[in-house]
Amino acid sequence: MLLAIDVRNTHTVVGLISGSKEHAKVVQQWRIRTESEITADELALTIDGLIGDDSERLTGAAALSTVPSVLHEVRLMLDQYWPSVPHVLIEPGVRTGIPLLVDNPKEVGADRIVNCLAAFHRFQSPAIVIDFGSSICVDVVSAKGEFLGGAIAPGLQVSSDAAAARSAALRRVELARPRSVIGKNTVECMQAGAVFGFAGLVDGLVGRIREDVPGFGGDDVAIVATGHTAPLLLPELDTVSHYDQHLTLHGLRLVFERNRDAQRGRLKTAR
């Protein structure tokens, strides 16, 4: 059983994956709030409470974090509480199997890397990956499995909250599809702007990529969505052809398997 930990700026996904390679399956997944000052002990208490008896069946762990302080605590947690479980943390120097054809590879978020890796592994074709999180990342992977770059926009909730915080007449609203693109009250107007506006933003970015990037105009390009708010926008999107709730977790699994196999089964355990 592989423990997969995906730490983002606002929320953290913890998953359990059984099997490996083509037989791998996410059997459990939890989503909890990210606390930037959380300690290794608090993390261990939370995760052990989630996975229960499966804690004794762990054969590996893989983690990423877009919050550097939390990645450090994840490392300490794995070393202290699961010292015999081999683990991989997605950070510079770790073999991911995906070349980063960008100006500064160290700047590319680990979440973007594993998403593109998982998309290419699944479809074996050029792909555009859209991750709907606190930011919306639209990333591009070539037919050779190379990360070509992408675009980043503020996420739906972040944008909606910012609008409410900076205007006395607006308030924080639930992200939901309104009755119409023409809102009849302030809440519906904000929902329409968020849902239909961001659907247009994503379709526009995908369309521009397909027009401007050589090799991305054909039918062989996989356009994959993932992320917590993706289901809200999927009915409004014209460009997305696939949705994978577990894309990031499978990307973590792929990196773990690559490093395990490269080291003949010997990955880092606590000293």
From Swiss-Prot:
UniProt catalytic activity: (R)-pantothenate + ATP = (R)-4'-phosphopantothenate + ADP + H(+)
E.C. number(s) listed in UniProt: 2.7.1.33
Involved pathway(s): Cofactor biosynthesis; coenzyme A biosynthesis; CoA from (R)-pantothenate: step 1/5
Broad EC category: transferase
Gene3D superfamilies according to UniProt: 3.30.420.40
Binding site for substrate: 109-112, 186
CDD domains the UniProt entry points to: ASKHA_NBD_PanK-III (cd24015)
Localisation: Cytoplasm
InterPro entries: ATPase_NBD (IPR043129), Type_III_PanK (IPR004619)
Pfam families, per the entry: Pan_kinase (PF03309)
Keyword DNA-binding: no
GO biological process: coenzyme A biosynthetic process
Keyword terms: ATP-binding, Coenzyme A biosynthesis, Cytoplasm, Kinase, Metal-binding, Nucleotide-binding, Potassium, Transferase
Family: Belongs to the type III pantothenate kinase family.
Described purpose of this protein according to its UniProt entry: Catalyzes the phosphorylation of pantothenate (Pan), the first step in CoA biosynthesis.
Protein name according to UniProt: Type III pantothenate kinase
Organism: Mycolicibacterium paratuberculosis (strain ATCC BAA-968 / K-10)
Gene that encodes it: coaX
